[in-house]
């Protein structure tokens, strides 16, 4: 989600998605995400959270939480320095806990109120608890690209892709991507459509390498 405007100070944004069915199949899925961002002189602080829970025929089918903290400081007109911490949990890929601590540079191209292209290059330390598979601590590279475009009808398209390789074994890689479209309903509320992809080249036994997620919902920004 994009914050509302570029005025200094605090701003918030978020989204809510829900789906369900009853009858031949009983399914419920609810997800909530949000951000709070402070823009100061040549720096910003960002807090992001996300949570999803679902049930299918009385059995849990989704249970995932995420918290992301990021500090970004302007170095030049086209370059930022950023560092971040992230915590994540996802029962359905046998991920009891994942902690990331990283830093890197972000390069900006053609940034204006209606569009912007960002390229990030850096790395992070990762501590991951996979339950019966134990805990691992490794370093990963972190390369990402993000593009945002708002057209004349105020419809916003955002696409992001991350590639994260183990530093001493590049064949061990993780990829994360997402595409979202927001259509304004009012000045502060949008209709949302999103598609997300997560790929792990070496998942635990019994876990698929690639996950796709499709969602529709309502977003807000203030």
List the predicted regions and their residue ranges:
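Transmembrane beta-strand segments of Gram-negative outer membrane beta-barrel proteins
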Residues: 4-22, 42-47, 157
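Predominantly the C-terminal beta-signal and adjacent terminal strand-loop region
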Residues: 168-222
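Detector for outer-membrane/organellar transmembrane beta-barrel domains
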Residues: 114-165
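Repeated loop/turn-to-beta-strand initiation elements of outer-membrane beta-barrel proteins
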Residues: 41-47, 78-81, 113-117, 151-157, ...
């Amino acid at each position: 989600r994009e914050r509302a405007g570029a005025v200094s100070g605090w701003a918030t944004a978020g989204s809510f998605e829900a789906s369900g069915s009853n009858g031949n199949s009983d399914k419920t899925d609810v997800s909530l995400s949000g951000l709070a961002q402070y823009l100061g002189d040549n720096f910003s602080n960002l807090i992001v959270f996300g949570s999803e829970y679902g049930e299918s025929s009385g059995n849990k089918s989704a249970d995932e939480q995420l918290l992301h903290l990021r500090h970004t400081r302007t170095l030049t007109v086209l370059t930022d320095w950023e560092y971040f911490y992230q915590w994540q949990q996802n029962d359905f890929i046998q991920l009891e806990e994942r902690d990331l601590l990283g830093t890197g540079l972000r390069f900006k191209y053609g940034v204006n109120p209606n569009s912007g292209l960002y390229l990030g290059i850096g790395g992070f330390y990762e501590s991951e608890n996979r339950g019966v598979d134990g805990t691992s601590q490794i370093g990963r590279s972190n390369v990402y690209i993000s593009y945002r475009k708002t057209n004349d009808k105020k419809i916003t398209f955002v696409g992001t892709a991350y590639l994260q390789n183990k530093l001493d074994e590049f064949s061990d890689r993780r990829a994360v991507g997402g595409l979202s479209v927001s259509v304004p309903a009012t000045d502060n509320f949008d209709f949302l459509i999103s598609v997300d992809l997560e790929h792990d080249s070496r998942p635990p036994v019994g876990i698929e390498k690639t996950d796709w997620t499709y969602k529709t919902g309502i977003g807000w920004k203030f």
